[in-house]
Regions:
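Non-transmembrane domains of secretory- and envelope-associated proteins
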Residues: 21, 26-29, 51, 128-132, ...
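Short, solvent-exposed coil/turn segments at beta-strand boundaries
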Residues: 38-39, 60-68, 81-87, 128, ...
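Short, surface-exposed charged micro-motifs
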Residues: 57-59, 77-79, 121-123, 150-154, ...
Length: 204
């Protein structure tokens, strides 16, 4: 009987050990999943909490070199579109469309989650039935002054996509959430015919 219990216990221990994953393995799998956004498109919500100014959120969609961001700040709705050459900014309150050359050569919105834990030590601080809670601590070798000292990351056990990432940069708390794969080109490409009545300011 004792031998039977020992065999059962050993089998359970082996099974648990085989299924357990380290924080590094979870993050590596997460990076692999978010890379699919290059071809499938990736959407997320970025919320910022700023002292005095308050809190506002932006819904971001990106696919390849194209991106679209919609934000409402103090009742004013603003929509941004961009590709490698041009940026369009539409302000709903005054029905104004500003067209400018893009400042970057790539889709910055799509890069928000790529290698986001690079330069950080990661460890599992807890888990639920649905997700892992991972603590990210900035490495001493990371000399980027803009990188926060710590980040709190939650990763879905089902999809391996981030569920939420919270970081504090100086006095600003930034939260990335509501991640989803699957964005069509039509969702992110600017269609000027939809804004033919807007006042256009072309700065190209």
């Amino acid at each position: 009987m004792k031998r039977l219990f020992f065999v059962l216990f050993a089998s359970m221990a082996l099974a648990f050990g085989a299924s357990a994953q380290t924080a590094e393995e979870i993050v590596a799998r997460m990076d692999k999943e978010t890379e699919k956004g290059d071809t499938q498109g990736l959407a997320m919500t970025m919320s910022m909490k700023i002292p005095i100014v308050g809190e506002f959120s932006t819904r971001i969609k990106a696919r390849g070199d194209y991106s679209k961001a919609e934000s409402t700040v103090k009742g004013e709705k603003v929509i941004f579109w961009s590709d490698t050459k041009t940026t369009w900014t539409y302000t709903a309150n005054n029905n104004e469309l500003v067209i400018e050359p893009s400042k970057g050569s790539q889709n910055d919105e799509g890069e928000l989650v790529k290698g986001i834990t690079s330069g950080y030590d990661v460890s599992i601080k807890g888990e639920t039935a649905d997700a892992w809670q991972i603590k990210c601590v900035k490495q001493k070798s990371n000399q980027d002054k803009d990188d926060p000292k710590t980040m709190d990351l939650v990763v879905s056990k089902k999809t391996y996509l981030p569920v939420r990432l919270v970081a504090k940069v100086k006095m600003v708390t930034v939260t990335l959430s509501n991640f989803a794969l699957g964005v069509s080109p039509e969702e992110v490409k600017f269609d000027q015919s939809a804004y033919k009545d807007a006042k256009v300011i072309d700065k190209r």
